[in-house]
Amino acid sequence: MSFVVTIPEALAAVATDLAGIGSTIGTANAAAAVPTTTVLAAAADEVSAAMAALFSGHAQAYQALSAQAALFHEQFVRALTAGAGSYAAAEAASAAPLEGVLDVINAPALALLGRPLIGNGANGAPGTGANGGDGGILIGNGGAGGSGAAGMPGGNGGAAGLFGNGGAGGAGGNVASGTAGFGGAGGAGGNGGLLFGAGGAGGVGGLAADAGDGGAGGDGGLFFGVGGAGGAGGTGTNVTGGAGGAGGNGGLLFGAGGVGGVGGDGVAFLGTAPGGPGGAGGAGGLFGVGGAGGAGGIGLVGNGGAGGSGGSALLWGDGGAGGAGGVGSTTGGAGGAGGNAGLLVGAGGAGGAGALGGGATGVGGAGGNGGTAGLLFGAGGAGGAGGFGFGGAGGAGGLGGKAGLIGDGGDGGAGGNGTGAKGGDGGAGGGAILVGNGGNGGNAGSGTPNGSAGTGGAGGLLGKNGMNGLP
């Protein structure tokens, strides 16, 4: 038995496009009709007259053929438009009885548990901070949380059923600029389906003098599912930027951890306002990678926020990268540490880079350390580079991560350059164990004096030692 799958909206869009093409061709034919069907003879002789008549005849034949083609095109567009309307009407007519069937199926579950068997949860109303409704017990996505009123937290996203995605958390409420108060925290994302489904993203923190933190991402499903991303921290206008929310954990068996939220920026009109720290990346499942850490927020008049640490894997998978530090007008934010690999196999996550420290005495942020590799196979994560000290010392480079039994150690991060102060020290390279080379040490940052170069990591039993960094 054959069947046809049709999308009425797509058919209607194609019909509209075809109508536009026909109109364009018709306009072009009309513009060309007069100069091509009445070709003037080049001279008064018989040959010129015959050639002009020949060309005019060809043009008239083309115009007649074009008229027939335009008629066919118009009929085809009408048929296509009518077909799209018929399919849409049939779809609407068949959906109504199905809704009644779903109501009958869901009624007992709603009466006993307050939750349908099949269907998506309701979204929280904006400005109320209400939580999103949970999805159907069997199949259904969680509803999104409602945004918060001024200074109030956003609602949490609803959880999914056995199959479905968690709802996104609502945004925290803002507080008007120049007004004292705390921004509302973003709502947490709902968890994914118990068996399959992704976690919902966390809500964004509210803008205020003391900004709200971003909401945590929801966890993925038990078997398969990606963790939700953490919400970004709100912008702080006088006190501090909000912290980024942590990424949700991946599914227990298969799934990547969610990315950590970005820290909120600190924008001070009076006093100082450091940037908020980035959120940590979520842990991966037994077979899955850890989520990357969120970047730290910028401190326009204050320190930059630290980058979030990368999430670690459980059994088989790479660790997440650490988030970069936020630029600060005084001290740059430190980079987040890279996540560790799974217990058996995987590479360690790279450490995040330290950020620039501005101002007359600005100090660069330190680079994050690289993550450790799995016990059997895997390379250590590279250390993050230290930040540049615009008016002060450079940041130290992060340490390279250790390798597994088979794998190379991670390279150490380079030290940041300092201006009128000491350069940052290079990070040491990570060591290898059995088969693999040690990581190279990070180069020293220039300054007054220069920093110390990082030492190379020890090589494995079957491997070479890493090279020391350049002084």
Swiss-Prot record:
Residue ranges for the region (Interacts with TLR2) are 140-230
- Fetch the SUPFAM superfamilies from UniProt: PE/PPE dimer-like (SSF140459)
Which residues does the UniProt record annotate as the domain PE? 1-93
Where found, per UniProt? Secreted, Cell wall; Cell surface; Cell outer membrane
Task: Tell me which domain of life the UniProt entry assigns to the organism this sequence originates from.
Answer: Bacteria
InterPro entries tied to this protein: PE-PGRS_N, PGRS_rpt
Residues annotated as region Essential for translocation to the cell surface? 1-30
Cellular-component GO terms for this entry:
cell outer membrane; cell surface; extracellular region
Chief location: secreted
**UniProt KW keywords:** Cell outer membrane, Cell wall, Membrane, Secreted, Virulence
Instruction: Tell me the function of this protein.
Output: Induces TNF-alpha release through human Toll-like receptor 2 (TLR2) signaling pathway, leading to macrophage apoptosis.
- Similarity-based family: Belongs to the mycobacterial PE family. PGRS subfamily.
Query: What assembly does the database describe for this protein?
Result: Interacts with human TLR2.
**Free-text note regarding domains:** Contains an N-terminal PE domain, followed by a conserved linker region and a C-terminal PGRS domain.
**What's the protein called, per UniProt?**
PE-PGRS family protein PE_PGRS33
Organism placement in taxonomy: Bacteria, Bacillati, Actinomycetota, Actinomycetes, Mycobacteriales
